[in-house]
Design a protein with these regions (language model features):
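Generic recognition of flexible, low-complexity loop/linker segments
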Residues: 79-82, 118-119, 162-163
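Acidic di-acidic motifs
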Residues: 88-100
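DNA replication initiation on ssDNA origins
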Residues: 1-90, 199-200, 206-210
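Acidic carboxylate-rich catalytic motifs and surrounding loops in phosphoryl-/glycosyl-chemistry enzymes
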Residues: 162-180
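Histidine-centered divalent-metal-coordination microenvironment in nucleic-acid enzymes
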Residues: 93-94, 112, 118-147, 171-177
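Hydrophobic, Leu/Ile/Phe/Ala-enriched alpha-helical segments that form helix-helix packing faces
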Residues: 45, 49, 62, 111-115, ...
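Short amphipathic alpha-helix segments
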Residues: 99-117
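Helical (often loop-to-helix) elements that flank the catalytic cores of nucleotide-handling enzymes
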Residues: 107-110, 135-160, 182-202
């Protein structure tokens, strides 16, 4: 199936004006050197290198807020709120966070190897994984929650890591950072509605995703 959807890119997390871009352009930003310095600095601060905790947290927030971001799950025009949604292309975002350090690499490889993973990369913190996968069939405002549940339950089972139910808003932004090993699979397999059982207890629904990067 041809994918013609152009996700909305924003100049920063504070920006409200969407600019359509291609998946290839997002991939080039992720794998190129444009955001390498900011990503490295953020991770150094997160590791507590050279700053007191309060100063480090403030600097991390500034870096994160200034990074560009994109909205992968809806077509937007004129803004970034629900009233600006013009369509649901079927692409669903997954936040995988809280991964124990000792199994992070294994978890990332499992995600990358899965044929449903369309886009996958390390988040700005270096401790999380962002995944985009596609649904088969029409996605609408009414069935978007079911589509989100289908995809997120799948990755919860695949990784054994809890997925936050509060991250299911369709206009959620994904920060663009530096990951030279980011995955882009244009021919990824699509998921079908109601083809998957519910995730195991504790795998969906946990702490707020507001601090995730």
């Amino acid at each position: 199936m041809e994918n013609t959807f152009r996700p909305s890119r924003f100049l920063s997390l504070r920006a409200t004006t969407p600019s359509p871009c291609t998946w290839e352009e997002i991939m080039q930003e992720l794998t190129g050197e444009r955001h390498a310095a900011a990503t490295a600095l953020f991770r150094a601060l997160a590791a507590g290198e050279g700053q007191d905790a309060e100063t480090s947290k403030r600097q991390q927030s500034q870096i994160k807020q200034n990074q560009p971001a994109f909205v992968p799950s809806v077509h937007l025009e004129g803004g970034r709120s629900s009233k600006h949604i013009k369509g649901y292309p079927g692409s669903i975002m997954v936040d995988i966070d809280g991964i124990p350090e000792e199994i992070f690499d294994e978890t990332l490889e499992r995600v990358r190897a899965d044929p449903h993973s369309f886009l996958a990369y390390k988040t700005l913190s270096g401790r999380g994984i962002r995944v985009i996968a596609w649904m088969e069939g029409e996605v609408t405002e009414e069935n978007f929650p079911a589509a989100w549940q289908t995809v997120n339950a799948y990755y919860a089972r695949l990784t054994g890591i809890a997925i936050d139910r509060q991250c299911k808003n369709a206009t959620r932004m994904s920060v663009i950072c530096h990951d030279p090993d980011a995955l882009y699979r244009p021919d990824a397999e699509r998921m079908k509605f109601a083809s998957l059982p519910s995730a195991k207890a504790g795998q969906i629904g946990r702490a707020s995703c507001r601090e995730r990067v």
